[in-house]
Amino acid sequence: MALSRRRFLQATGSLSVLGAMGAAASVPYSQGEDCPRLVPPSGSVDCHMHLYDSRVPAAPGATLLPPDASLDDYRQLQRRLGLRRMVIVTPSTYGTDNRVMLEGLARSGTDARGIAVVASTVSDEELARLHGAGVRGIRFNLSTGGQALDGIELLAARVNELGWHVQLATGPLLADIAPRLAALPGKVVIDHMGHVPQPEGVLSPAFKALDGLMQQGRTWVKLSGPYLRSKTGAPHFEDVGLVARRLISHYPQRLLWGSDWPHPTQSLQNKPDDAALLDTLLDWAPDDQVRQLILRDNPVDLYGFA
């Protein structure tokens, strides 16, 4: 199949970046070459990653248009981190077109679950088809030009009957929408630690809203994307670490970890070191049993891994 001009430019740009990272760098869209110091428990899950394929057109108005990032690319990261299971999240790039995510599920068997984006008019038959493919939740993305919360209450009720949850990338809106989320039936998953702003951190209205949702007992939080809000930066993200530690100390049984690979909000020259991201858990959650909850037990329960 001939390369389109867009795909050719993406490929050559990616090769240039990989060359800048060093000839031995083997994982696309990830800095560094070392394996993490943290050895994940067997059966651990990367609860947040995306796949991109430019053969599937982007949705009108999409603001994130990353280069292709394939399942084979991601499997290189899995080998580096010592992981096998993952949750494939349809990104805002494709709107309600879940084909790239579904292809990833079909190729991954029981090692993967999916999070779909659906229209408020989605049919029961389509939801059943998605469930059979391995989808276990729907996502609303308010941070990068994704869809608004129109119809979230009705959709939440419908997917709750399937045992699914509602996942949200809230951007800066968490404090404003928390009352609506608190009233939803079923489980809610918040991406990227609620995008709690820094340097306000645990004193911010966003964190207070997040803490209130967690106190209800039906909300899960992904310890992912620390670079999105950190002012102190890599590798330790000390400011975001204060938010993570507070959550871990109070709600260890409803936390998840995700890589956010291929880090679509970050430029090709500024991708994080995924091994270092995983190693933040050594500082944030020094107890082995707590890390086992975050990396394996919690996601196995939430996503229904066997």
Role assignments for model-derived ranges:
Residues 2-22, 27-43, 68, 72-85, ...:
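Mid-to-C-terminal alpha-helical segments outside catalytic/metal-binding sites
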